[in-house]
A protein has these predicted regions:
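Hydrophobic packing and interface segments
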Residues: 1-180
Length: 180
């Protein structure tokens, strides 16, 4: 439940930062929600008298989740996409080859991050006298704790695109298109 509260607070952060560039406002909410979650988890774990290693497992999962999200953002909207589009100038086969290679490259770092989270959380939990599998489970909770804000932001994109398309097709002014 503290993950949900952190996600709601992250959504409010997006609302407060909406005067900025929209992508930066969304990113700030996505990055601050896990920080809020970890702070709340710290107080909850202190109240429950759990060892600090459990909190470190949560932190490893939360950090890993943020890193995987940033890597995904890069591979779905950064230079790799532009390079795939540029490869279309030479034909369909090069688009398929470059798309396949970028797709294969895009999973390497997230897999390494997941493996690191598993190793770190297993060793942390074991050092606290808890089974390593419990540490991995707690790290997964940390990773998925702010899924609420992630889903909200992912759902926002298509809605904003559709609103922008409707504004454009209906001949509304540029200022309407700028805010949609």
């Amino acid at each position: 439940s503290i993950g949900l509260i952190a996600s709601i607070m992250g959504i409010f952060i997006v609302k407060l930062a909406s005067a900025k560039e929209p992508a930066n406002a969304l990113r700030s909410g996505t990055l601050l929600a896990p920080v809020i979650f970890v702070a709340m988890a710290y107080f909850l774990m202190q109240h429950m008298s759990l060892p600090l290693e459990v909190l470190y497992c949560v932190i490893s999962g939360a950090v890993g989740g943020v890193l995987i999200g940033l890597i995904t953002e890069y591979y779905t909207g950064g230079n790799p996409v532009k390079k795939i589009a540029e490869s279309g100038e030479t034909g369909a086969a090069t688009v398929m080859i470059s798309g396949l290679s970028v797709g294969m490259q895009s999973v390497v770092v997230p897999i390494l991050i997941l493996a690191t989270i598993i190793l770190v959380s297993t060793s942390l939990a074991s050092s606290a006298g808890i089974t390593g599998v419990y540490g991995v489970g707690i790290a997964a909770v940390g990773m998925l704790s702010t899924v609420g804000i992630t889903m909200a932001i992912d759902a926002y994109g298509p809605v904003a695109d559709n609103a922008g398309g409707i504004a454009e097709m209906s001949g509304m002014g540029k200022e309407v298109r700028d805010i949609t």
